């Protein structure tokens, strides 16, 4: 069933000759039950500002608008703009389109004067999803410009985002996410929900910023985690040589023969605060 008398998404794709481009990391989400489920996962959004990245032909966009959200959608692919403009006509004053590369967008400036923080809700393009998340996790000042994030990733990336110490998926992304936010996998999305169908399962991750994360420089924590996990099978005293190695490990009371995947987030914060 189409939403609010708009054409079915398959018809939109045919009308505008839209095909997902692998180079842009595109996989169009067609299942309207799933788009509604993603929108619902973000909580009550009626009358609330929402930021969507990579709307494509507008499947998730329509679900967000149908729930009353005020959507700012950033789309790099100019081919999709005419289809999105048709949706904009149907929802006057509810949808703002920006044709831009999300990696180059100044989000703080975009929402700086807004009285209410946006919720970021998106089926992120696979090729920029992780980098966008890192940018949003390391943004300054903190608390950030957004209220929450409800994002689609490949299942393996979602596991890395939410992983705990001592697990194979635990790494830099897990530490940076857990430091500043509380993240959980909400539900999985099968490949057949997309066109074209990816080879892997996807997962929707819900992320809420912590009001007061452990005190630490984002830049230093980013550096220490990148260095520590650079060669994850090596001992910390070897991986951290360029950052003071055994000296900072001794000051932190951390055994230099441990591996990065055994450290808690608070231990990484302690190490980061010792970098000069």
Curated annotation (Swiss-Prot):
Keyword Zinc: no
Record localization: Cytoplasm
Alphabetical list of Pfam families matching this protein: RrnaAD (PF00398)
CDD domains in UniProt: AdoMet_MTases
Function noted in UniProt: Specifically dimethylates two adjacent adenosines (A1518 and A1519) in the loop of a conserved hairpin near the 3'-end of 16S rRNA in the 30S particle. May play a critical role in biogenesis of 30S subunits.
Keywords assigned: Cytoplasm, Methyltransferase, RNA-binding, rRNA processing, S-adenosyl-L-methionine, Transferase
MF (Gene Ontology): 16S rRNA (adenine(1518)-N(6)/adenine(1519)-N(6))-dimethyltransferase activity; RNA binding
UniProt superkingdom: Bacteria
One cellular-component annotation, GO: cytosol
Name of the protein this chain belongs to: Ribosomal RNA small subunit methyltransferase A
Binding site residues for S-adenosyl-L-methionine: 27, 29, 54, 75, 101, 123
């Amino acid at each position: 069933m189409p939403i609010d008398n708009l054409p079915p998404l398959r018809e939109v794709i045919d009308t505008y000759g839209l095909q997902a481009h692998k180079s842009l990391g595109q996989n169009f989400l067609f299942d309207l039950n799933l788009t509604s489920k993603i929108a619902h996962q973000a909580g009550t959004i009626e009358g609330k500002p929402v930021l969507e990245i990579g709307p494509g032909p507008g499947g998730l966009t329509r679900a967000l608008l149908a729930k009353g959200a005020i959507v700012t959608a950033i789309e790099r692919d100019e081919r999709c703009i005419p289809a999105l403009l048709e949706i904009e006509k149907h929802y006057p004053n509810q949808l703002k389109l920006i044709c831009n590369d999300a990696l180059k967008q100044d989000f703080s400036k975009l929402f700086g004067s807004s009285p209410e923080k946006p919720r970021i809700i998106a089926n992120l393009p696979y090729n920029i999803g992780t980098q966008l998340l890192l940018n949003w996790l390391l943004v300054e000042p903190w608390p950030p410009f957004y209220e929450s994030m409800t994002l689609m990733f490949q299942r393996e990336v979602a596991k890395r985002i939410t992983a705990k110490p001592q697990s194979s998926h635990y790494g830099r992304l897990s530490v940076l996410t857990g430091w500043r936010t509380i993240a959980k996998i909400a539900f999985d999305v099968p490949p057949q929900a997309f066109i074209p169908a990816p080879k892997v399962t996807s997962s929707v991750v819900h992320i809420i910023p912590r009001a007061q994360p452990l005190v630490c420089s984002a830049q230093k924590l980013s550096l220490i985690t990148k260095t520590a996990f650079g060669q994850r099978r090596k001992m910390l005293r070897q991986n951290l040589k360029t950052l003071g190695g055994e000296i900072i490990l001794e000051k932190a009371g951390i055994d230099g023969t441990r591996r990065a995947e055994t450290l808690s987030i608070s231990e990484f914060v302690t190490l980061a605060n010792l970098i000069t």
